[in-house]
Design a protein with these regions (language model features):
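Feature marking well-ordered beta-strand scaffolds used for ligand recognition
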Residues: 4, 15-458
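N-terminal secretory signal peptides that target proteins for export/translocation
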Residues: 1-11
Length: 458
């Protein structure tokens, strides 16, 4: 590249935007504000040197290990083989497996499945019983694009972690993320923005259901679900998380909505009791997030502290156990202050199907009780505009969350109305995507650095 050219990295190394290269004559042009999931965003990145302001910063945490050969990492999972502890890493390279048994701070590479150009495998899930991994193929994988690219799911056998083996691949009309439903007998696959072949009125791809009870012959159901989620408009479903009570929470543009996927339940929309299934789930609760907390309306992932996980998510107080939802807003605006934040909302008032009746004329929104963003916080780089919240994990009232170039942040959420930062780790070259609590450490999938292994010191 000639010296007089510049690389605009406003959206470099973030899961929602493309690398844009322009000449110096265009460098001063104001780039439009976007959120994850706009027409051509959240695609593969081109590696480039990071331009940083302040050097790296850390407090109350130390790095005990790093796995640089996992550069391009996007998601992690952990599988147990008797006394053997194996970490599964998915990313732009495909899949890698590491043995943590002898030393969890020094993962040992034991196997890999090479898929160069893979995208995106975000929040990759595993079947811990059958030892399988589900890799979601975004239409932008292998040089494709949102409008016409192929999407689908790879089912990978990890019975022998040294030899990851593809059992099957199935084309699916969505492919940004895929999630286990009903103990990994089914998959829900959603996102990204809509293809040219999909209805023009859609804002993004909803969820398609795949029956994987026979993993060598997966069956995709033709009719999508989780429609009309954005005030009556079918829109981008980004990811799904299952809470400890078995409710599947779908996050995306328009908020977070929960569903029963098995058993008999009263449908709050119809008022009738009916069986729930992966292909015909029963609405439970949830709805849009108030725009004063999340102006983009694009919710990325969520966590509901309930059941065995209730103690992890802070004091429910007068809201009652199971009535809180933690959710990431992923959004990128010019500068840092307007980027996506962590939102904590109350589910009170949403159990009657309100989130399914919401319209632009009569919108329904959950009540926000707390938020936290990285802009202006101790440890942040004021020169970086790469500040959106991303994936998080919660244990014992400590929420660890990735903020891309602003690194990894540890928050005390014992009072959900007032999350407080207690530690941070921000290397100068950070591209933190997803943290995971495991064996007392926080393992961070960093798209630039590989895997950072962190330990709180206070």
């Amino acid at each position: 590249m000639a010296r007089w050219e510049v690389v605009v990295r406003r959206w470099l190394l973030r899961s929602s935007l493309l690398l844009v290269t322009v000449t110096a004559a265009l460098a001063a042009t104001t780039l439009p504000a976007m959120a994850c999931g706009e027409e051509q965003t959240h695609g593969p990145h081109t590696a480039a040197a990071r331009s940083t302001g302040a050097p790296g910063a850390e407090k109350n945490v130390k790095a005990v290990g790093n796995v640089p050969d996992a550069q391009g990492a996007i998601a992690l999972q952990f599988l147990q083989y008797g006394n053997r502890d194996v970490m599964v890493v998915s990313g732009e390279f495909g899949l890698k497996t590491y043995d943590l048994t002898a030393n969890p701070a020094a993962p040992k590479l034991i196997g890999k499945l090479d898929m160069p150009g893979m995208w995106e495998t975000e929040d990759t899930e595993v079947d811990p019983l059958r030892k399988r991994v589900f890799l979601s193929r975004d239409p932008r994988a292998f040089g494709g694009n949102v409008r016409t690219g192929e999407s689908g799911v790879y089912i990978v056998d990890l019975a022998k972690p040294e030899k990851p083996t593809v059992l099957s691949y199935v084309k699916v009309p969505a492919g940004h993320t895929t999630s286990c439903i009903n103990d990994c007998q089914y998959l829900w696959t959603g996102g990204p923005a809509k293809a040219d072949s999909q209805p023009a009125e859609w804002g993004g791809r909803p969820i398609w259901v795949t029956d994987i009870r026979d993993p060598r012959k997966p069956k995709v159901f033709p009719q999508p679900i989780e429609l009309a989620r954005n005030d009556g408009k079918t829109d981008y479903v980004h990811d799904v998380q299952i809470d400890a009570a078995g409710v599947a929470w779908a996050s995306g543009r328009g908020g977070v909505r929960g569903y029963w996927t098995e058993g008999m339940h009263k449908d709050p929309v119809t008022g009738k009791v009916r069986p729930a299934s992966p292909t015909d789930p029963v609405p439970y609760a949830g709805g849009g997030i108030n725009e004063t907390a999340a102006p983009s309306k694009f919710m990325h992932n969520s966590f509901r502290p309930v059941g065995s996980m209730a103690p992890d998510g802070g004091s429910a107080g007068h809201w009652g156990n199971g009535n809180l939802i933690y959710a990431t807003e992923e959004s990128f605006l010019d500068g840092c202050a307007g980027d996506g934040v962590l939102v904590i909302a109350s589910l009170e008032g949403s159990y009657g199907g309100e989130g399914w009746r919401s319209t632009p004329q009569k919108p329904y929104r959950l009540k926000t009780i707390g938020t936290w963003g990285v802009a202006g916080q101790e440890g942040s780089d004021p020169a970086s505009a790469d500040c959106s919240a991303h994936y998080f994990d919660v244990r014992d009232n400590v929420l660890v969350q990735s903020f891309y170039a602003q690194g990894t942040r540890f928050l005390d959420v014992s009072d959900p109305t007032n999350p407080k930062q207690i530690a941070y780790y921000r290397p100068a070259d950070a591209a933190a995507w997803a943290p995971y609590w495991h064996r007392g450490f926080a393992y961070v999938a960093d798209n630039n650095r590989g895997i950072d292994i962190l330990q709180l010191t206070a």
